[in-house]
């Protein structure tokens, strides 16, 4: 987990200048300060060549007009490198201080921030702000929870496709309930305060049971509502089925209140901040709210550093994002 490396960094005496938005803006008011912070966060001590992974303090520092701007030349393979290569900051014309501000606001706001608002805040176009936020969301996927044990709540929800918000000409018949004609299905698992979500094509037993078997360790207890898609779970786990349609919401102290509470946070965030999300990008937004939920016990500074470290894990281009 990335958080272990970040925690280790601060335990070694690394100063955290990110406990408030004002402190963060004052601490990172130049490109050099942002770059040096990234180098400390990623490299700890000595520069690491992105080509041959050579780690040494005497890599050449290349200067332009007598000034060093973070470009190194590897002393072993002779390839130029810098701390931004392989991260979401690579080849970006946006200054790092604007990236830092965007990441801080994105992670500290409980419901996120819209691209329109971010564009106004940092002085970029809405298209650029949307791409920045999408890159941030994509980078957070590297810390997505991949396995669960213990008591694991599972549930599914439907997002989008509300007919009452459409004109009569665009309304689709028979979209109520579990219809997927105009709605996307999101499946979620929650255990020990951590949640993971996945867009699924349907809520059939084969679909849901396969995900549960892949993500929940054997010997765990799986808790669900009475939906028939969970009817085969008992063959693989101890299964607590709580039939909500019969007015039952707790069974032997087991419930699905936590995962249902997460659905409320997700839907309120999408409706209140983003208003609507296309099915194509819905997974990124689900991952955003999963990250925010999974780091709910972090303060703003630790959450910012955690998200910043995720920037080193994955990078997506604009072409791939809109493809």
For each feature predicted by the language model, list its residue ranges.
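Residue-level recognition of single "structural anchor" positions
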Residues: 1-323
